[in-house]
Amino acid sequence: MSCRILLRRPRALAVSLFALIFTSGAPSIAQQIPQVVVTATRSEQAITDTLASTTVLTREDIRDTQATDLPTLLRSAAGIEVAQNGGPGTAASVFMRGGNSSHTLILLDGVRINSSTLGATALERLTLEQIERVEIVRGNVSALYGSEAIGGVIQLFTRQGGGAPALGGSLTTGSRGTLSGNLDYGGKVGDTRFYIGLAGFHTSGFSAINPDTNAATRAAVNPDNDGYRNTTVNANVSHLINPRNEVGLRLYETRGLVNFDSAFATPTTAHQTRNSTSSFTAYSKNRILDAWRSTLTFSKSVDSSDQTLNFKWDGHIRTDQRQLTWQNEIALAPTHKLLLGAESLSQRAESESTTSRFYPARQIGSVLAGYSGSVERAEFQLNLRNDRYSDFGRTNSYFAAAGYNFTNEWKAIAQQSTAFKAPTFNDLYFPNFGSPNLLPERARSQEFGFQWAAGVHLLRVTRFRTDYTDLIVSAGTPARATNVAKARVNGVETHYNGQWFGFDLRTNLTLQDPVSVPADAVTGPQLRRRARAFGNIGVYRSVGPWRFGADLYATNKRVDTDITAFPSQKVGLASYNLLTLTARYNVTKEIYIAAKVDNATNAQYQLVHGYNTPQRGFFLTFGYQPK
């Protein structure tokens, strides 16, 4: 049965996935220490104990997929869809469980790096060479993290030093003039850990917009290739003063230059954006009492972009966020933990163009409390949070979940939560569009599911529903930002990680119904760029010094709007399958050679109507990584 047929029949895809997992003749279950995560509760917890649906992508997963950027890596995770306006470096959006792209909070080592003007995060800028681990928590967790965490949270952890100081690096070359490199040095000397890494990326790319989409684009779009280059630095140092106290500093900065197309220009018009994302963190971790751990953190992040039109200045946007966080974890008993915290966040922005300028700012004060624990076979988690915004006032959110272990391997989980997203500065103050009296967007979610955790196997099936209210859209004449839209997403999400007959298997499937209530006047009930069925199967096998892999992503059709039509018109985005083939050869324990065939079947597809996507590509990597 082909993947195309499976996606036309979502139930058949679900049955096939379960048949693959629960096949006869399964191997004996090996014992394995569960991965430890922190994002699901803001404190350390085994992934098998999390009540929120959580996925971890490790450094080994990144090596296996050989993903060139963060959007490509995230596409392989459960519940996540990605849209992008062209090739590497162009604007990318993440839709988690059918929510809007601004409904996913992105954290870098715990630091907010989103734009307070646009509301989303420029994740296309974040290079994977300096990422050690990605933790993904799906579902409403505003009670833990505040605004934007409606669809979930994606937290990126940068690489850090450990062990004897050593030098590492890699060099990749491939199709479309792609060249990337990474050099890092880190380790531990006495009670001090340190790391510094440098990464660079360049690609000649391809034309972002297909000029043959229609007559309008043929008259407006520059057909030249839209290239991208990026440089990244990641540095951190920490010192253990004594067994109870640690201090540290982290610095991350990435700068890029991307060429892009506009459907409303001429075939000779040149568009460029210079952008940067940076974060700085200073922290102190202190064990005040044996049962009381306290962390005080100051962080600053900056997101900026400068656009040029025909190499002349055309606009500037900058977001500056400064946050002070005091978090306390108190062990009430061996299986009972209390979380108490307070945050102060300052947001400022600069938005300048040839026609308008505004410089908004606001202050946010937050307090949060949480409990997690277990009594015999029952597990519980409760989180409460209050946020006070200087522009629209107070808002409360909660997260309540319970689990019951039928056996040591099988567990039932249920949860309910509320969440919110604060209006962006553009929503509130953009000239001739913003409305300063806007309310935050709201959401309420319910989930119920089962988990099977046995040795190397982890399977989770979740039934979820999220209702959105007060969504901010453009409405009226003249158009203004208004709290009038509603949406609802019902779905079932399945993901499995494990080993069978020597193969490492990572699979997921999401069946969902993302609808606007009432139906959108142009695109109808289905939310734009979101499919009703999509999934991923990754299979990897080690044979001696070799490591082979195949990764198949498949999605069914979506709807979008024509980028050139006025008034807007509904268009369809066809279903597609993407196959990636990888191989890695370990020359020694430290030296390796890796190869990848991206889009191996040369599938023709679109993530955004009118925008091109990468064709088949070949990539070769040489690397040295000390063990």
Spans of features found by a protein language model:
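Outer-membrane beta-barrel domain signature, strongest for Gram-negative TonB-dependent receptors
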Residues: 221-338, 342-347, 458-459
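Short acidic/polar hinge/loop motifs at secondary-structure boundaries
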Residues: 111-138
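Periplasmic-side early beta-strands and strand-to-turn transitions of outer-membrane beta-barrels
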Residues: 142-143, 155, 162-164, 168-172, ...
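Repeated loop/turn-to-beta-strand initiation elements of outer-membrane beta-barrel proteins
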Residues: 191-194, 244-247, 257, 288-296, ...
